[in-house]
Design a protein with these regions (language model features):
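Short alpha-helical donor nucleotide-sugar binding micro-motif in glycosyltransferases
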Residues: 95-96, 103-108
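Short hydrophobic beta-strand element within catalytic cores of glycosyltransferases
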Residues: 134-138, 148
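Conserved acidic donor-binding segment of nucleotide-sugar-dependent glycosyltransferases
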Residues: 150-151, 155-162, 171-176
Length: 238
């Protein structure tokens, strides 16, 4: 398997230090930054983030959620924010340049990836992990089984299971150390394995194996150029 996107090298310590939220809500609790980015369309399910925000606010968490993007659901989402009185904790700044989105990722504590099976890969997962975010992602997204090791470099929830999404995010809200650990591991997954240098090296090695050694099976167990096996839709949790 081999898709990589947006790989950048950071000083890991400086990257994670930048995520130590300086804001407070008056009760001296950290204000956690939560990010969602993409087209505001049905199969990306941005509305799941709004329902999550409602639940977090009801539970008394201090957070700031940002949804970046435009699309057919934009008005609906604005209405949800207004109707649920979430204006103080949810913002929708609209479309942004890729560099601006990356800047938000570099500061975000948690990244939400809520798409369903229509998301063939989802390069935004590479980018958010590369930015050191603790990712909570739907199991249906094409890249998730290849990039995320559940509870090691991110958290996975069953597609469409709002309660499970909320539970996973609450785990990260409650444990800053664990959140930072997942984010740092996510960064190293992309920076050390899913990058252009590794891709070039492995592609050459794979071609030489096929041409000269007549080996048709990839020598790599995971990462770029590893075998992309057919997976059942309900692979998560098995």
């Amino acid at each position: 398997m081999g898709i990589f996107s947006g790989g950048k090298k950071y000083d890991p310590d400086e990257l994670m230090k930048g995520k130590l939220s300086a804001a407070s809500d008056g009760l001296k609790r950290p204000c956690v930054s939560i990010l969602w980015a993409g087209r505001l369309i049905g199969w990306k399910h941005p509305d799941a983030s709004i329902r999550l925000a409602e639940s977090l606010k009801e539970k008394g968490y201090s957070f700031k959620m940002t949804l970046i993007g435009t699309g057919e659901m934009e008005e609906q989402l604005h209405n949800m924010i207004r109707d649920k009185s979430l204006e103080d904790c949810v913002e929708m700044p609209g479309a942004m340049k890729a560099s601006e989105v990356r800047s938000y990722m570099e500061k975000a504590d948690i990244y939400l990836f809520t798409s369903d099976f229509n998301e063939g890969w989802g390069a935004v997962l590479n980018e958010s992990m590369n930015s050191g975010c603790a990712v909570v992602a739907s199991h249906a997204i094409g890249s998730v089984p290849f990039l995320i090791k559940d509870e090691e470099n991110g958290l996975i929830y069953e597609n469409g299971n709002q309660k499970q999404l909320e539970q996973q995010v609450c785990r990260l809200m409650d444990d800053a150390e664990y959140r930072m650990k997942l984010g740092l591991n996510a960064y190293h997954t992309i920076a050390d394995l899913w990058n252009a240098d590794v891709a070039a090296e492995r592609l050459i090695d794979l071609c030489e194996n096929i041409i000269f050694a007549k080996k048709t099976k990839s020598p790599y167990e995971n990462g770029i150029c590893s075998e992309a096996k057919v997976m059942e839709n309900d692979w998560f949790g098995k």
